[in-house]
Amino acid sequence: MSLKVVFMGTPDFAVPTLAEIVGGGHEVVAVYTRAPAPAGRGMALRPSPVQALAERFGLPVLTPSTLRGPEAAETFRAHGADVAVVVAYGMILPPAILDAPPLGCLNLHASILPRWRGAAPIQRAVMAGDAETGVAVMRMEPGLDTGPVAMLERVAISPEMTAGDLHDRLMPLGADLMHRALGALERGGLTFTPQPAEGVVYAHKITNEEARLDWTAPAARLHDRVRGLSPFPGAFFLADLGRGPERVKVLRARSAEGSGAPGTLLDEAGTVACGEGALRLLRVQPAGKAAMEAADFLRGRRLEPGTRLA
């Protein structure tokens, strides 16, 4: 026996889970994803990674602009799904959708719930300097990531791990976890535990303001911020490159020894003074350019020790 599944997801993170469900023998009766969006230099419409995979599998794809209203609910119920699997879909599911599948809606969430409920759990965990995070399979409720948890896989966050590194580590783990959860659900053996009332922290969307590096902060905190925002959207500073202040992303860095006025470039290797200690820039990306080693960037733009970065 296999389950009839509606899959709902959009970005790369959701792709391995869809592939695992199809490979596991379940019948994916529909795939919901966000509509194609402009991308690339030509801003041509590009389907989401989930849509691209679904079409390769020959699965029916829906890209509704809303799931609210009786028509959307009726369309969803008409799929006759036993369960819905939701992975980074990017749209709120109203009660009429949540209540439609007899076995409920399962969500794969990239954190150890209830810590980091919300939109940016991977980035927030790294930015906060957390030593571990994980992936969880939960049953969805109307509240934001408040549902009971069935399965959890923990992962250590190493001191130099970026959000991109962690994202790539959690993707296959999450896919395997959901595969096991569906197997248990099929056998009637999937049990759910309510989330603790204590320890709730929300992973709000990243703002442009917090992506800018504040050199008056301690170097350790800035290091975590660089890791948590790499590769996207990228922590950044401003430097005068001859045409006024230009944005430069910092993709990799590490804490270093050094002192001086915050934001001062201390050497040719890319060490910048912070409120406490210093930050060594390792890899950067100037606006509109490819990523490069920080020392090469400084040498090419003739940014010498004593230069102030904003």
UniProtKB/Swiss-Prot annotation:
It holds the Pfam family Formyl_trans_C. GO terms for cellular component: cytosol. (6S)-5,6,7,8-tetrahydrofolate binds at residues 111-114. Its EC number is 2.1.2.9. Keywords: Protein biosynthesis, Transferase. The keyword Transferase applies. It catalyses: L-methionyl-tRNA(fMet) + (6R)-10-formyltetrahydrofolate = N-formyl-L-methionyl-tRNA(fMet) + (6S)-5,6,7,8-tetrahydrofolate + H(+). InterPro entries: Fmt, Formyl_trans_C, Formyl_trans_C_sf, Formyl_transf_N, Formyl_transf_N_sf, Formyl_transferase-like_C_sf, Met-tRNA-FMT_C, Met-tRNA-FMT_N. One of its GO terms (molecular function) is methionyl-tRNA formyltransferase activity. NCBIfam families: fmt. Belongs to the Fmt family. Attaches a formyl group to the free amino group of methionyl-tRNA(fMet). The formyl group appears to play a dual role in the initiator identity of N-formylmethionyl-tRNA by promoting its recognition by IF2 and preventing the misappropriation of this tRNA by the elongation apparatus. HAMAP family: Formyl_trans. This is Methionyl-tRNA formyltransferase. The lineage of its organism: Bacteria, Pseudomonadati, Pseudomonadota, Alphaproteobacteria, Hyphomicrobiales. The gene is fmt.
